[in-house]
Amino acid sequence: MSRFIGSTFKKSRRFGFSILETGKEFSKGKKRITTPGQHGKERAKVKVSEYGQQLQEKQKVKFMYGLSERQFRNTFAKAKKMQGILGTNFLVLLESRLDNIVYRLGFSATRQGARQLVNHGHILVNGKKVDIPSYLLSVGDLVEVKASMKKNEKVLEALQNNEATLEFVKVNKNEVKGEFVRLPERNELNSEISESLIVEWYNRLIKK
């Protein structure tokens, strides 16, 4: 399955969940818990099976982080090799991706935009260009926008509008740089994610 690059609002409306984690997709008062389409309300009343709940949760988080199915599955496999709680480790790995930290630092208004900054070589890690969005950062890594992009209108606008206060990252807006201070704790991440359903989904596949 390819990476989703369509309307964020449509996906957020479908899942009743802010993929941007800001609620901006619903800022015009159009938030819906139903699925898109003329008969969304009728479909929403249908009881979702356990399988359906697991699939929906997987899709929701996959779209939120902007990963392809293969990337998502590989990240889960990597989390299984770590000590600790599998679901939490999985989310921590997703959060440790370079494109996600660029987003968390406020250098882009969306994860998709952050991914483009990385892909185009506009991001430095510890002073060196890294153009791989899936690059996993280590605690203490310094992330900054390269000099030629520090006055970019979109970057500055994103920084100005970023009101998030996350303790696992530290940002210097004046210098357009930041630090991955520590690994995030589960209570700092999206409470609307039920990672246990994703664990159950992949465990189901393994048993087949």
From Swiss-Prot:
Q: Where is the S4 RNA-binding domain?
A: 96-159
In alphabetical order, the GO MF annotations are: rRNA binding; structural constituent of ribosome
Would you tell me the Gene Ontology cellular component terms? small ribosomal subunit
Q: Does the keyword Ribonucleoprotein apply?
A: yes
Q: Which SMART domains match?
A: Ribosomal_S4 (SM01390), S4 (SM00363)
Q: Which Gene3D superfamilies match?
A: Ribosomal Protein S4 Delta 41, Chain A, domain 1 (1.10.1050.10), RNA-binding S4 domain (3.10.290.10)
Q: What does the similarity note say?
A: Belongs to the universal ribosomal protein uS4 family.
Q: List the keywords (alphabetical).
A: Ribonucleoprotein, Ribosomal protein, RNA-binding, rRNA-binding
UniProt name for this protein: Small ribosomal subunit protein uS4
Quaternary form? Answer: Part of the 30S ribosomal subunit. Contacts protein S5. The interaction surface between S4 and S5 is involved in control of translational fidelity.
Q: Does the keyword Ribosomal protein apply?
A: yes
Q: What does this protein do?
A: One of the primary rRNA binding proteins, it binds directly to 16S rRNA where it nucleates assembly of the body of the 30S subunit.
Protein's GO biological process: ribosomal small subunit biogenesis; translation
